[in-house]
């Protein structure tokens, strides 16, 4: 349960961060999952960004009047 809460907080931090900070946050999340994940050698975690919109976080477009 604690792991789920921690991962949820980390994921929220990743999604709320600007693009450059997302890469750092994903590296932290990936390192955490590799260190504290299940003991099976066949389980691998990879967290990657889809490099979506680079304009995220700039706010709404301004209104344009005629």
Curated annotation (Swiss-Prot):
Keywords: Secreted, Signal. The keyword Signal applies. GO terms for cellular component: extracellular space. Disruption phenotype: Exacerbates bordering behavior, where animals accumulate at the edges of culture media. Enhances clumping/aggregation behavior in a G-protein coupled receptor npr-1 mutant background. Decreases locomotion quiescence, in an npr-1 mutant background, during the sleep-like state called lethargus which occurs during molting between larval and adult stages. It is found in: Secreted. Its main location: secreted. One of its GO terms (molecular function) is neuropeptide Y receptor binding. May be processed by convertase egl-3. Expressed in the ADL, ASE and ASH sensory neurons, the URA motor neurons and the MC, M2 and M4 pharyngeal neurons. One of its GO terms (biological process) is neuropeptide signaling pathway. Residues 1-16 form the signal peptide. FMRFamide-like neuropeptide. Involved in modulating locomotion quiescence during the sleep-like state called lethargus which occurs during molting between larval and adult stages, acting via the G-protein coupled receptor npr-1. Plays a role in modulating social and feeding behavior. Belongs to the FARP (FMRFamide related peptide) family. This is FMRFamide-like neuropeptide 21. The gene is flp-21.
């Amino acid at each position: 349960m604690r792991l789920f809460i921690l991962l949820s907080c980390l994921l929220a931090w990743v999604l709320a961060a600007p693009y450059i900070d997302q890469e750092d946050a994903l590296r932290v999340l990936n390192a955490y999952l590799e260190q504290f994940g299940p003991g099976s050698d066949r389980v691998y975690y990879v967290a990657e960004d889809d490099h979506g919109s680079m304009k995220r976080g700039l706010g709404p477009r301004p209104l344009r009047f005629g």
